[in-house]
């Protein structure tokens, strides 16, 4: 019995760690939004790192609020093919101080039938006003 339990648990852990979003239905696409804090790099190779502060940030697709960054990072959502606008807005309890994460950001994507697109949206910390 313990051997069976151990095998079941290891299978569950492997499935959780190596997760890939399911393929979209025919004629549709799947978009996964990966929210991160932009800490440097170049436009071609941004250095974008996970930040737990972004978990509650709202994700808007084509102007409609569609959940939070935490909701979108695993399986994303099924969308129609074509061009879409992604916006990520951080909830503010108070004004941002210099260096605090993050300023709202966005991205444009074009989805194709059968595609699973993982789109990174990098949000910057508030810069100094110098």
Give the predicted meaning of each segment:
Residues 17-130:
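Short loop/turn and low-complexity linker motifs enriched in small/turn-promoting residues
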Residues 1-15:
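Sec-dependent bacterial lipoprotein signal peptides
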């Amino acid at each position: 019995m313990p051997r069976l339990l151990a095998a079941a648990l290891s299978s569950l852990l492997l499935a959780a760690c190596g997760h890939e979003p399911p393929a979209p239905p025919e004629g549709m696409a799947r978009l996964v939004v990966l929210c991160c804090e932009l800490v440097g790099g170049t436009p071609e190779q941004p250095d974008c790192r996970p930040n737990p502060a972004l978990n509650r940030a709202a994700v808007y697709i084509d102007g409609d609020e569609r959940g939070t960054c935490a909701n979108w990072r695993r399986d994303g959502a099924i969308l129609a093919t074509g061009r879409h606008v992604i916006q990520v807005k951080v909830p503010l309890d108070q004004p941002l101080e210099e260096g605090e994460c993050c300023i709202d950001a966005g991205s444009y994507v074009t989805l194709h039938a059968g595609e699973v697109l993982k789109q990174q949206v990098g949000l910057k910390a508030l810069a100094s006003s110098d």
